[in-house]
A protein has these predicted regions:
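Residue-level recognition of alpha-helix initiation/capping sites
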Residues: 55, 77-78
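ATP phosphate-binding glycine-rich loop and adjacent ATP-lid/helix-beta elements
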Residues: 50-58
Length: 115
């Protein structure tokens, strides 16, 4: 299973705001986020744009729901220092070493970041 790479840019611009890699696990109705990266200009208090990571997570959620509809799930294995951040800011749930979204939480993050 190869990961597929996606990039987030502003329409008509070439500057990459964020990157995401996804691997599909069809037997599990799950998309795994392997890489979730936000450009340096868009991190921390002085960031240029807000919501880059949320938009990438929402894109993964939408991709999963298009593929597996109501049984869809997305997951990621976060860096230790980001685990609490993903849970508090994006509402991700504990699934052992991984965090995940499924069901209504997938729809909520899509509505919030991809209106």
């Amino acid at each position: 299973m190869a990961a597929e790479l996606f990039k987030l840019t502003l329409e008509g611009e070439s500057e990459i705001l964020g990157l995401l890699t996804l691997t599909d696990f069809p037997g599990e109705f799950r998309m795994q986020i392997h890489l979730l990266c936000v450009s340096r200009d868009n991190q921390g208090k002085g960031k240029k744009y807000d919501g880059i990571a949320g938009s990438l997570i929402a894109f993964a959620a939408r991709t999963a729901t298009v593929k597996d509809f109501d049984q869809a799930c997305i997951s990621l294995l976060p860096k230790t220092e980001l685990r609490a951040h993903y849970k508090s800011k994006y509402g991700m749930m504990d699934g052992g070493p991984q965090l995940f979204h499924e069901g209504a939480r997938l729809q909520a993050i899509i509505k919030k970041y991809l209106p």
